[in-house]
Regions:
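TPR-adjacent "capping" and linker segments in tetratricopeptide-repeat scaffold/adaptor proteins
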Residues: 32, 99-123
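TPR-repeat structural position
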Residues: 54, 137-138, 171
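Divalent-metal (often Zn2+) His-rich catalytic cores of metallo-beta-lactamase-fold enzymes
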Residues: 3-56, 60-95, 167
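Short, small-residue-biased leader/transition segments that mark boundaries at the very start
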Residues: 1-2, 192-199
Length: 200
């Protein structure tokens, strides 16, 4: 619609990324971006209408490969799954399809139960570190977050959490993802230092 009205721009300065110069390149970038977003919307809605959970939608929705390769559509700031999460909220609300999330137990209680199942804090920390060593950083993050929820003042928990999230930040492509993981690691380094001072 924008281009049918005769609008032509020679320069596009996006919110994230490098400027795009030249009327044809600007037109291509805007058209590709619109198509990229439309495919995420249509895939998300189709899966939601089929009864998929948020996790299933997040694992299934992918931008078209030919568009995902475009330089201006690289996940530099955020990532496609963040767009999908926002589409889920827009069209489906906050409920993610997991019944226990409807009225969840407090994180500290859940963390303590996970600790009990793992045989204690040392076992959970060790397993999180072992998973991280295998490159399974997302799963390691879940385990260490449960450990922090259960024992928020424990020095070794924060040391492990910082290690895991520093690795996650180093592997992240998107600025938003890297920023959140880096902030988490810094927070735990600070907590680790505070716990060490308090124990002296």
């Amino acid at each position: 619609m924008l281009f049918r009205s005769g609008f032509v721009a020679d320069l596009l300065i996006p919110g994230h990324g490098m400027p795009i110069v030249g009327a044809e390149r600007v037109r291509q970038a805007l058209t590709d971006t619109a198509e990229w977003l439309e495919t995420l919307v249509s895939q998300t809605l189709a899966l939601m209408n089929a009864g998929a959970t948020l996790e299933e939608v997040l694992r299934s929705v992918k931008p078209p490969a030919r568009l995902a390769e475009r330089r201006y559509l690289q996940p530099v700031y955020d990532e496609p799954d963040y767009v999908v999460r926002n589409l889920w909220r827009l069209y489906g609300g906050w409920y993610d399809g997991v019944p226990s999330h409807l009225k969840p137990a407090p994180a500290a209680e859940l963390g303590r139960e996970i600790l009990a199942l793992a045989g204690g804090l040392d076992g959970l920390i060790a397993r999180a570190r072992a998973l991280a060593a295998l490159g399974r950083l997302a799963l390691a993050g879940h385990l260490i977050d449960w450990a922090v929820a259960a024992e928020p003042d424990h020095r070794e928990v924060h040391a492990a959490r910082a290690e895991i999230y520093e690795r996650r930040a180093a592997e992240a492509r998107a600025l938003m993802t890297r920023g959140i993981f880096s902030a988490t690691a810094r927070e735990s380094r600070s907590e680790e230092h505070t716990s060490e001072l308090q124990s002296q």
